[in-house]
């Protein structure tokens, strides 16, 4: 077997060092599942949340290791915001389903499928199936009405939701959204 050239060896060492740095201090998906999501009722959801959080944190660390700035930093932040928003949206769904099971949902939004309150909500035999048909906006409103989250967190989540929705490029252009490091930090803080 032919030995690797010094350039290949150096390149591999560099890649390994960046990978070690990116993984340092973020925990494994299994650790994140236990540390951050043990309150989530659904086992599959808990695992998916931990994997998504791991990916977002790993991208953050990778951006640090590569000293990402400008367009590269914007790309890193965009993906992190989308992931943090997805985590928040899923956590709200889980908490709403748990509150529904306990009969503690408040307000009237939870009785309607849409935020305009035109289509009655049919929770049916499996509330998890019903909740999957709702929007992030609906989940924020129901959570706030039910006291699951306060108005400050609801405002932060609406901001994250709007940033996440700029995955639709025409909306990004229309809204004039520019991704910057603080945006990912705020999304991460709201998720916590």
Where are these regions (language model features)?
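Charged alpha-helical initiation segments
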Residues: 1-78
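Glycine-rich, flexible loop segments associated with nucleotide phosphate handling
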Residues: 72-81, 128-133
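Residue-level detector of well-ordered alpha-helical segments, enriched
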Residues: 76-83, 91, 156
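Short non-catalytic regulatory patches outside canonical folded cores
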Residues: 89-155, 174
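Charge-enriched, short contiguous segments at helix-coil
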Residues: 144-192
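Alpha-helix N-cap/helix-start motif at coil-to-helix transitions, marked by capping-box chemistry
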Residues: 50, 54, 130, 154, ...
């Amino acid at each position: 077997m032919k030995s690797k050239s010094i350039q290949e060896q150096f390149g591999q060492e560099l890649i390994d060092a960046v990978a070690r740095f990116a993984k340092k201090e973020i925990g494994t998906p299994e650790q994140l599942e236990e540390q951050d999501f043990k309150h989530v009722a659904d086992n599959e959801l808990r695992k998916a949340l931990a994997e998504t959080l791991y990916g977002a944190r790993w991208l953050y660390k990778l951006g640090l290791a590569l000293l990402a700035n400008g367009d590269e930093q914007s790309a890193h932040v965009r993906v992190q915001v989308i992931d943090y928003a997805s985590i928040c949206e899923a956590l709200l769904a889980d908490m709403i389903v748990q509150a529904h099971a306990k009969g503690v949902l408040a307000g009237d939004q939870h009785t309607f499928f849409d935020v305009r309150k035109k289509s009655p909500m049919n929770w049916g035999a499996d509330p998890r199936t019903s909740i999957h048909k709702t929007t992030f906006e609906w989940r924020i409103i129901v959570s706030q009405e039910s006291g699951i989250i306060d108005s400050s967190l609801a405002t932060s989540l609406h901001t994250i939701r709007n940033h996440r929705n700029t995955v639709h490029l025409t909306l990004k252009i229309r809204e004039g959204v520019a991704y910057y490091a603080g945006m990912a930090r705020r999304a991460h803080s709201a998720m916590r």
